[in-house]
């Protein structure tokens, strides 16, 4: 609400189709300000779950653009949803990391100063971000705001080149001819080099600076990445070098790739096994959702046994009993892991412990 003093009050959208200028910015700024003041809350990590909510809605054929023409009060109310808030804020974060924090700040400052006590269209923001950076944001950003959905980017190594291809991601496996101007941050895990690319066509060839590219350096892009089997195995060798957000995105992207048959179940399960020792509650929230979906598709006791074994290492560290010395994050993590183990492992002694507590 404090952020709305600038985004919504000082500068106000001209019409309801631009409500994302208020709400997406407020959602982003609350994280930026809180992270600067209370870094121990790790709110950037929380944005992973917000983006996942946006993915879930935007992967459906019934999705809508972040910005669309509003003609009735009912349509105005429809704007206040996960696409305006969660997708809008993470798209802004994606462009902040692509053009650079200082360039992004400069563009936003100029936007607020130029249009203070006035009303704006989205194009006014895009033009200021274009002026502040080396990229034509006024051509790139509309592909994310004016059309529904988002892409999945396929990655291939071809001799000395890197081939990137895009298609629209839909959870039912279908697609259409939508294209995005995709800002891509790449980190080469083997050479430690980084570079930025802009994928504007269905498929493009780029020069590569290493053999093990991790797409979406930092983990903030609003698209999925599908790696070849060979690349996924190579990236797995550098798993410990990825930060929390990158690990989250690697698992989420691979899970979504599996769901539309772009990677094999064997490759996905090999990757998933690397996460059993992770201590981030958001990663475990993602893992819990994955196992829940798997079990709905294949409700077999062998899968339940696998899930139980997956949880064991973390349970041994966390324990099942509440501790006053635990941090908030550790308490939340214990709740997630214990709940997952209790639901699928068929460990009666473990479950009876919690039944006794309840009674």
What is the role of each PLM region?
Residues 3, 41, 55-57, 66-73, ...:
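Non-catalytic accessory/interaction domains
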């Amino acid at each position: 609400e404090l952020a709305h003093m600038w985004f919504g009050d000082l500068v106000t959208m001209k019409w309801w189709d631009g409500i994302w200028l208020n709400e997406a910015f407020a959602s982003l700024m609350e994280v930026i300000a809180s992270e600067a003041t209370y870094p121990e809350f790790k709110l950037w990590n929380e944005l992973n779950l917000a983006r996942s909510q946006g993915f879930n809605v935007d992967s459906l054929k019934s999705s809508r653009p972040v910005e669309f023409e509003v003609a009735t009060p009912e349509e105005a109310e429809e704007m206040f949803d996960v696409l305006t808030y969660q997708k809008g804020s993470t798209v802004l974060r994606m462009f902040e990391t692509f053009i650079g924090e200082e360039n992004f700040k400069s563009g936003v400052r100029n936007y607020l100063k130029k249009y203070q006590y006035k009303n704006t269209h989205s194009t006014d923001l895009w033009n200021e971000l274009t002026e502040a950076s080396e990229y034509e944001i006024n051509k790139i950003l509309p592909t994310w705001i004016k059309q529904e959905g988002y892409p999945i980017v396929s990655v291939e190594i071809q001799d000395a080149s890197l081939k990137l291809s895009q298609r629209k991601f839909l959870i039912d496996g279908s697609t259409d001819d939508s294209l995005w101007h995709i800002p891509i941050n790449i980190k080469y895990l083997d050479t430690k080099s980084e570079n930025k690319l802009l994928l504007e066509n269905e498929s493009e060839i780029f020069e590569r600076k290493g053999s093990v590219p991790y797409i979406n350096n930092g983990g903030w892009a609003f698209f999925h990445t599908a790696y070849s089997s060979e690349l996924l195995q190579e990236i797995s060798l550098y798993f410990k070098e990825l930060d929390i957000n990158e690990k989250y995105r690697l698992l989420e992207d691979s899970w979504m790739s599996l769901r539309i048959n772009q990677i094999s179940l064997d490759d996905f399960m090999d990757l998933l096994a690397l996460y059993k020792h992770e201590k981030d509650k958001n990663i475990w929230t993602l893992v819990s959702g994955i196992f829940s979906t798997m079990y709905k598709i294949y409700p077999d006791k062998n899968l339940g046994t696998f899930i139980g074994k997956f949880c064991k290492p973390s349970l041994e560290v966390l324990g099942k009993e509440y501790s006053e010395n635990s941090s908030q994050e550790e308490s939340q993590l214990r709740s997630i892991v214990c709940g997952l183990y209790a639901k699928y492992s068929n460990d009666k002694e473990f479950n009876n412990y919690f039944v006794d507590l309840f009674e």
